[in-house]
Regions:
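Edge beta-strands of jelly-roll/beta-sandwich modules across compartments, strongly enriched
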Residues: 53, 118-130
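Short, surface-exposed beta-strand/strand-loop-strand elements in extracellular ectodomains
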Residues: 73-87
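Short beta-strand segments within Ig-like beta-sandwich modules, predominantly Fibronectin type-III
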Residues: 89-95
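Bacterial N-terminal signal peptides
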Residues: 11-21
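Non-catalytic extracellular/lumenal accessory regions of secreted precursors
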Residues: 24-54, 60-64, 130
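Hydrophobic beta-strand segments within beta-rich accessory/binding domains
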Residues: 55-71, 111-114
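Bacterial N-terminal signal peptides that target proteins for export
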Residues: 2-12
Length: 130
């Protein structure tokens, strides 16, 4: 009985550890809302090291999206994933993207993931859809 309890305890600790690690890597998730009559949304936020903020944005195939990010220390970057979960060309994670513009290939929710390149980052994200 003692060995079984130890095995289950070890599995529970490992599962909890993995869950907490996954939660620590995600900052805020927000839906992008455009002010009435506007095509640009300005979003402000802050991310700490090893976390990412996610912005969800509904758009249609053929629309052009432009994304620009600024931060005081130039240490905030983003990646964009299409509705299929695949990164858009030129906006892949790890590419340290600060500016991107392109025609959207599909209709649905796009995810913009903001992360710091070093330390913590306070940022302003501008998203335009036309």
């Amino acid at each position: 009985m003692g060995k079984i309890a130890i095995k289950y305890s070890a599995v529970a600790v490992l599962t909890l550890s993995l869950l907490l690690t996954a939660l620590a890597q995600t900052g805020q998730t927000r839906r992008v809302r455009f002010p009435k009559g506007r095509t640009t949304a300005v979003l402000k936020g802050a991310v700490i090291r090893a976390t990412q903020d996610q912005f969800l944005l509904g758009a249609r195939s053929g629309q052009t999206m432009t994304v620009h990010i600024t931060s005081l220390e130039k240490n905030a970057v983003f990646a964009i994933l299409g509705p299929n979960g695949v990164a858009l060309d030129g906006a892949e994670e790890g590419s340290d993207v600060m500016d991107w513009s392109g025609e959207l290939p599909a209709s649905g929710d796009y995810s913009i993931w903001v992360s710091p390149t070093r330390g913590n980052a306070t940022y302003t994200l501008e998203v335009t859809i036309r």
